[in-house]
Amino acid sequence: MTKPAVQKSGLHPRNRHRDRYDFPALKQSYPALIPFVKVNAYGDESVDFANPEAVKTLNQALLQHFYQIEHWTIPDGFLCPPIPGRADYVHHLADLLAEDNRSVVPRDASVLDVGCGANCVYPLIGHREYGWRFTGSEVNPLAMKAANETIEANSGLNRSIRLRRQKNSKAILAGIIHKNDSFDAVMCNPPFHASAEDAREGSQRKLHNLGLDKRSPLNFGGQQDELWCEGGELAFIGQMIKDSVSFGRQCLWFTSLVSRKEHLPEIYRALEAVDAEKVRTIDMAQGQKQSRFVAWSFLDTAARARWLQKR
């Protein structure tokens, strides 16, 4: 008898990953996943999430099965993101845009992904789900090369996803948003940690949570610019807020994930200091994990509605 689907509580209603992974279907769609799928102690099929190659292959299977991404890979040592959580940000962002568009998610929206990474997952999902056009910024040339290889290897993506190199490691939006650009949304998954040591401690916590020895050579993946920056998440978002002032008439919504809820009060103060017209906090959840993104706009309600009507 087929087991009833168990939903991952909290995920967006349109998220294709609300149910537990359907490994029989994934294996059929992507046979390379077969060697990594084992029956766990609960009698369910799963993969070893402590094995980077298994996680990468699972991502390849998910991207092919749900989003028709036939060719996707990342270099060793780069961040391998969980697809369900990344998709949630995209869907909640779609709802935010719909609020100013008579409750209709705009097709062909133009979105800037700050720090798209080697994985380029937000543009891939956003384009496949909603037909959005993406500009991805990236400071790491190797990450940019890998992302571009994915774009070129999949039919039609190079007409809808473009990449721009951020040559100034201290800048976030400056140098990426050009004079004649306009974006319906900016999205960002900022570096979480404040130092390399902080990032190492984070990996040790993951090892502990997985029940593994701290001396295990496990590589969770992630380059310096993906995992940490001076001052961590709060400093990065603070700089993004300052940068956004210069582009307040070129972008409808600026958004950024915020991993630590305790950072919100300082973020709100920073947004008040730059006279943001509208600030929203969108809560998200995946099981026990709580997350959110903060959105701000320098346009009032009427101006935001006119923006989308003129698209």
Curated annotation (Swiss-Prot):
Signal peptide: none
Catalysed reaction, written as an equation: adenosine(1618) in 23S rRNA + S-adenosyl-L-methionine = N(6)-methyladenosine(1618) in 23S rRNA + S-adenosyl-L-homocysteine + H(+)
GO terms of molecular function: 23S rRNA (adenine(1618)-N(6))-methyltransferase activity
InterPro entries, alphabetized: METTL16/RlmF (IPR010286), rRNA_lsu_MeTfrase_F (IPR016909), SAM-dependent_MTases_sf (IPR029063)
Disulphide bridges: none
Enzyme class: transferase
GO cellular component, one term: cytoplasm
GO BP, sorted A to Z: rRNA base methylation
Coarse class of the protein's main subcellular location: cytoplasm
UniProt cross-references to CDD domains, sorted A to Z: AdoMet_MTases
Subcellular localization(s) per the UniProt record: Cytoplasm
Short name of any one Pfam family annotated for the protein: Methyltransf_10
Sorted UniProt keywords: Cytoplasm, Methyltransferase, rRNA processing, S-adenosyl-L-methionine, Transferase
EC number(s) per entry: 2.1.1.181
Tagged with keyword Methyltransferase: yes
NCBIfam families, per database record: PRK11727.1 (NF008725)
Biological function: Specifically methylates the adenine in position 1618 of 23S rRNA.
Family stated for the protein in its record: Belongs to the methyltransferase superfamily. METTL16/RlmF family.
PANTHER family: RNA N6-ADENOSINE-METHYLTRANSFERASE METTL16, SAM-DEPENDENT METHYLTRANSFERASE
Name used for this protein in its record: Ribosomal RNA large subunit methyltransferase F
Organism: Pectobacterium atrosepticum (strain SCRI 1043 / ATCC BAA-672)
Gene that this polypeptide is encoded by: rlmF
